[in-house]
Amino acid sequence: MDKYVAISIMCRDENEYLHEWIDYHSAIGVDHFYIFDNDSQTPISETLKQQVENGLVTVENIYGVGDTMRQQRSQSEAVKKLTEYTWVGLLDTDEFVVLLDDSTNIKDYLKQYEIYGAVGLNWLLFGANGHEHKQESIINSFTQSCPSNGANKHIKSFVRTKSFINTDHDPHFMSTIHGTVNVDLGVIKGPFNNPPILDRKMRINHYVTRSMEDYNQKRLRGPGDGNGEKKITKYSDNFFKAYNNEDVQNYDIIKLKERIDNEN
């Protein structure tokens, strides 16, 4: 098995989204997935039993409500455990990496950044597409993007393991020996890349609300890092409205999937 790029996530009770998320990222060339299961009611190791057995997925169980640094500590732990990989992406289950140029393999993109410590990809936020209820496919069902939303300045990073120092300050930004750049090689010194780069090389589709039903469950569940009531309050009606006030249809990820299917 190739060991060039892995992705790590932390989640709780988001099992239903994992198959599509893993299948998609496997199709674009991700070699391994390291998942922190934060006390899910149905263990993720059961949901992904086949993927765990064939070595595609590693699940580590963690328990209980954490503090504000829980996600950062888990990210650091994942990178340190995955040093046989050149790159580790630190994402969430509602984030999908989109390749915007000709290649359908993420390895072709990451090889361009091997002298740097990390590459930061901007979010492009997506809303609910008017869906009240859960949909079978996130990728095919949610095409309502929000390109003008100020939160698109946020990045998520792929970090080169040999350059990694820590994620002590922010889950959106890694401290590295060789620094972080955006996809155009501009220097990034914090959790934002502004103006965001949304139309070339790589970005992250962030399906922040999914449907109204998904969103209401998210409000009850709280964040995947288990920070409890303190952070559940951020998922308000106004939060939902903020990510559903634009309707710019974006099909980039669907077109990428079609290119992959045509190659196979």
Describe every region a protein language model picked out.
Residues 72-73, 99-264:
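Catalytic-site signature of metal-activated, phosphate-bearing donor transferases
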Residues 1-23:
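N-proximal low-complexity "stem/linker" segments adjacent to membrane-targeting elements
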Residues 38, 92-96:
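Short acidic donor-binding/metal-coordinating loop in glycosyltransferase active sites
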Residues 31, 86, 117:
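Short acidic/polar active-site loop segments enriched in Thr and Asp
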Residues 43-90, 98-99:
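Active-site-proximal specificity loops/subdomain of glycosyltransferases
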Residues 9, 36-45:
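Ser/Thr-glycine-rich phosphate-binding loops at phosphate-binding pockets of nucleotides
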Residues 31-39, 60-64:
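Short beta-strand/loop segment that forms part of the nucleotide-sugar
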Residues 23-32:
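Short, acidic, metal-binding catalytic loop of nucleotide-sugar glycosyltransferases
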